[in-house]
Amino acid sequence: MKEIFRPEWNCGRYHKEESKSHALLYNLIEGMAYFFEEESADIVGAILRFPKNAQIPLQALVESTANEFTEEEIVEFCNELISVGLLTEGLLTQSVIKENRKIIGELRKKQSIEIQKTVQERLPFQQNDAEDTYMDIIEKYRIPFVVMFELTYSCNEKCVHCFNPGAARNENEKSTRTEREEIDILHYEKLLNDLQQIGVVKIILTGGDPFVKKDIWKLIEMIYERDFALDIYTNGLALLGRVEKLAKFYPRSVGLSVYSANEEIHDSITRVKGSLKKTLLVAKDFADNGVPIYFKCPIMNHNATSYYTVSELAKQYGATPQIDITLTDSVDGDTAITEQLQVDGELLEIILRDPNIPLYVGKEAPNYGSQEKDKNQAFCGAGTVLMNITPEGDVTPCNSFPTQFGNLKDKSFIEIWNNSKSLDVWQHTVIADYEECGTHERCGFCNRCPGQSFIEHGTPLKASTANCYSANARMNLAKKLIKGNDPLNGNSLEDRLENFKAVPIEKI
C-alpha cells in the first residue's frame, strides 16, 4: 500500500461508552455517510484524530485496536475506505479535486432527472441509514445530533412568510429584525468547543440569511476545523461569486429558497426584484462545484398554483426539491402566516394528492397517510436530537419553538444542557402528557408541531389550531378517496391547479 492520507473532504464523530464503540464518517464530496461499530469504529476514531490532509501511519491504526488486528488486516480495511473516498492513497492536488467535484456535480444532475423517488422519501432533514443509526445510538446517551445556529435575523430578502420575530410582511409594516444584541464570534468559538466535546455531529447555519452575518467565514472555518458536518439554509444572494470559496469548506448540503419557477411569483414572495435569477445563478455555481443542494419550497397561497414547477427546475441543477405544505407562525406570536397564507379548501385537497410532499394523502401511503403514534414517545426530536441557538444566544429546542432554557451570555451550552430543569422536563414530555392530542380520529393524520402550539397558546401541551386544521383536511380527504372521490378527477395535478388563480401578494 502507498502512503495513506485523511482527505480534506471527510469529517465525522467517534463515540465510546460502556465498552461499545461507534463512529460516523462522511464523504462530503459524494454526500454520503458511513456507520461503523466496535473495532472498525476504533480505527475510524484513530483516523479522526489526524488533521485533514495528514498522512496516517498504519502503526497508529494498529494500536487503535489494542493490536488485535495485524497490519495486513488494517491495510485491507483501509482499502475499503479508499474505495468509497474516505481515505486516499497520496495527497490529491486541488486541480484533481476540483475536476472530481465537477464530475460528481454532472452526475448528480443526471441522477436527479432519471431517479424517480417513491412516496415519503422526501424528508425535511434528509438523512441516510448511517446517520439515523448513529443518531439513535447517541440519543440513548443524551447527546444531540444537530444544533442549529440562527446567526442573525437580518436578511437581504423580505419574505412574506418569514417567521423570524419582527419580520414585516408588507411595505406598510416596519421590520425590527435587526434590533438584536447578537452574540459574537467568541461566543460561537466557545459554543463550538462545547458541542465538539459533547459529540454533536452536525451544525445548521440559518437566519435571516447567514451570509449577512459578520464573521460568517471565520465561523464556517471553525466549524470545518472541528469536524462538524455542515448544512446551510440561505437564499444565496450574498454568495454570488463566492460559491467556490464556500465549496472549499465542504458543506454537507446547502438549502436554497426557491418558491416557484415563475419569476414574478417567486420575487413577489421575497419582495426583492430579480431574486430568483440571482438564486439560480448561485445554484448553477454550486452544481458546477459538486456541492449537494436542495430547493426549499413552502407552499402558500401565493405559489400554490405553481409550486410544483420547483421540482422540474431542481432537475436542471441536480438539486433535491424539499416541498412542504406546513407553514409556521412567527415566534413572536404573530399568527398572520397560518391565518392568511395557509392554503385551504379544495385547493389544499388537490395539493395533498401530490406524492412529492411529505403530507401526501393517497392509497400508496400506509393507511392513506395516517400514522399511529406511540403515546409514550415525543412528537419530535426538538430538545433532544436537535437544539437551536438564537442570534441573541438563547438556547431553545428548535428555531420554531421559542421556549428558552438559558442564554450563552450567562452560561455555557454544557451547563445549560446538563443543568436546565426546564430542558429536563421537556425531554421527558411525551404525547400522553398533551391535553388533547391523540384523542381524536384526526390525530393519526396530524403533523404535530409543539412550537406552533407554543406560539398560539404559550404552552406546547395544547393542540395547535393550524395543526388540527391540517389534520382534519387530510383525514377528510382520505375518507373521500376511500369512497372513490378523488379531487384530481382523473386529471393530472398540474391540470387541476390550472383551474385556480394564484392569490396576488397585494391581498395579504
What are these regions (language model features)?
Residues 1-50, 75, 101-102, 113, ...:
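Acidic, low-complexity/disordered tracts enriched in E/D and polar residues
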Residues 2, 14-15, 174-176, 250-252, ...:
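Radical SAM enzyme [4Fe-4S]-AdoMet core and its adjacent flexible, acidic
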Residues 32-145:
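Long, charge-rich, low-complexity alpha-helical segments
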Residues 76, 86, 105-245, 249-253:
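Conserved alpha-helical substructure of the radical SAM core
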Residues 121-144, 362-369, 406-433, 442-444:
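Short, charged low-complexity linear segments at domain edges
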Residues 156, 160-163, 381, 396, ...:
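Cys/His/Pro-rich metal-binding microdomains
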Residues 402-508:
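Flexible mid-to-C-terminal extensions adjoining Fe-S/redox cofactors in radical SAM and related proteins
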